[in-house]
Amino acid sequence: LFCRRGFNIDSLTVSATNDPSVSRITVTLRGTEQALNQLILQTERLEVTRQIFELDPDKSLQRELLLLKVACDAGNRAALREISSIYKAKIIDLSPDSMVFELIGKPDKIDAFLKMFTDYKILEQCRTGVTALERGGMHQHMQKPPQQVRSAQLPLPGTNCA
């Protein structure tokens, strides 16, 4: 469905929810407002879709996890620790020749953190993809009784869809 409509998926996460019969899929993608509306309408028609809705980026919480392994030695270890401290990243592994950082934050924070490593040798990196919830109480779409909806949940947040 996404490929046929020409959408480029930036991020896709799937997770369990407090309801064991429901999985939550969060898709981050770019497209025109018209194309996003069309995608929402078509996804609603899928048999497995319980709900689909757009989260306003200004009214939602978005987070992503980055694991980053960087080559290091005695000469650059202090500088790498300083970058880690500025971004509040955790050093979760340290060896004589590498450091592994863990950073949780908004995608733009992750991007900015990664830009700080352009002069260092990145050995490995892995990003989880964005997951999101609406701020405050229960999202208005989540208040529908289960019998009024079908069988799975596909939240599709904002134009940046996180």
Indicate where each model-derived feature is located.
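Long, contiguous binding/interaction regions
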Residues: 1-23, 28-162
